[in-house]
C-alpha cells in the first residue's frame, strides 16, 4: 500500500486529498506546515510527497530543497500542488527538486492515478 505525505495548510485541501487517496488504497500522513512536513517525511519515508507551494512557514520550493538535500528523503518524488499554471512555473519547479505538478482543486476522478504515477517504483 503506497504512502502519500500531504503537506498543505488548508484543512479542506488535506481532507479532500486524504479521502480520495485512502478510498483508492493509499495510506496518508498529513502536515499543515513545511517544517512539519519535512520532519514527517524523514520519520515516515513516504512513497510520494504532495506539497502546496504556499505554506505559512516556508515556501514549498524551500521545503522541497530541504527534502532533496537529505539522503533519507532525496529519492522521494515531491509533487507540487498549486493553482499556478504549470507553464508559468515548470522550470523553477524542476530546479527546486519537484518531480511534477498537479492542479488544485484536485480532480477526484483522476487524482489517485496521477499520484500513483509518481510513487517510487510505481
PLM features: residue spans?
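Conserved acidic carboxylate
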Residues: 8, 55
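Acidic catalytic/metal-coordinating carboxylates
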Residues: 12, 33-36, 59-65
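Active-site residues of response regulator receiver
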Residues: 52, 82
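Short hydrophobic/Thr-rich beta-strand motif most characteristic of the beta2 strand and flanking loop
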Residues: 25-32, 40
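Charged docking surfaces used in two-component/phosphorelay signaling
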Residues: 15-23
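Alpha4 helix (beta4-alpha4-beta5 surface) of REC/receiver domains from two-component response regulators
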Residues: 18, 62, 84-102, 109, ...
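Short amphipathic alpha-helix used as the core "switch/output" element in two-component signaling
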Residues: 39, 61-74
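The feature encodes the CheY-like receiver
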Residues: 56, 74, 86
Amino acid at each position: 500500500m503506497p504512502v502519500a505525505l500531504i503537506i498543505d495548510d488548508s484543512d479542506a485541501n488535506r481532507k479532500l486529498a486524504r479521502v480520495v487517496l485512502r478510498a483508492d488504497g493509499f495510506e496518508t500522513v498529513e502536515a499543515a506546515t513545511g517544517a512539519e512536513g519535512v520532519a514527517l517525511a524523514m520519520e515516515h519515508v513516504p512513497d510520494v510527497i504532495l506539497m502546496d507551494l504556499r505554506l505559512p512557514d516556508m515556501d514549498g520550493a524551500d521545503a522541497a530543497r530541504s527534502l532533496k538535500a537529505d539522503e533519507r528523503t532525496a529519492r522521494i518524488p515531491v509533487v507540487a500542488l498549486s493553482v499556478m499554471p504549470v507553464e508559468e512555473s515548470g522550470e523553477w519547479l524542476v530546479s527546486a527538486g519537484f518531480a511534477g505538478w498537479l492542479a488544485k482543486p484536485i480532480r477526484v476522478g483522476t487524482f489517485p492515478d496521477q499520484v500513483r504515477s509518481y510513487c517510487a517504483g510505481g
